[in-house]
A protein has these predicted regions:
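Charge-dense, helix-prone N-terminal extensions
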Residues: 1-105
Length: 105
């Protein structure tokens, strides 16, 4: 399944004007990197992948509709899968903010 171009466009618009953001096709989706660090992606499996502080992941899963991201049956610490909805801007900002806090690559 290809990523949802409408979601990708919404992400693109939310991150517009940030010169540190780069788009990169990967794993059937479209990733948005901040200073070379993945922040958020329009997933090839639908919805959104969001990078968060690994210490906050469990709390976010418990308090939101986010689910842990799994790759090959393993949960990926610091990554959440989210269905795109009205809260998309908050999730994109959460991913952008965390990726911005990491050292540039």
């Amino acid at each position: 399944m290809a990523y949802d171009e409408a979601i990708a466009q919404q992400i693109r618009e939310l991150l517009a004007g940030d010169a540190t953001v780069e788009e990169k096709k990967m794993f059937g989706g479209l990733g948005f990197l901040v200073n070379g660090n993945m922040a958020v992606a329009a997933s090839g499996q639908g919805g959104l992948l969001v990078r968060v502080d690994p210490t906050e992941g469990e709390k976010l899963v418990a308090s939101t509709k986010a689910e842990p991201m799994e790759m090959r049956g393993r949960q990926m610490a610091g990554w959440l899968r989210v269905e795109a909805g009205d809260d998309l801007p908050e999730w994109v900002e959460r991913g952008r903010s965390y990726a911005s806090s990491l050292p540039p690559k």
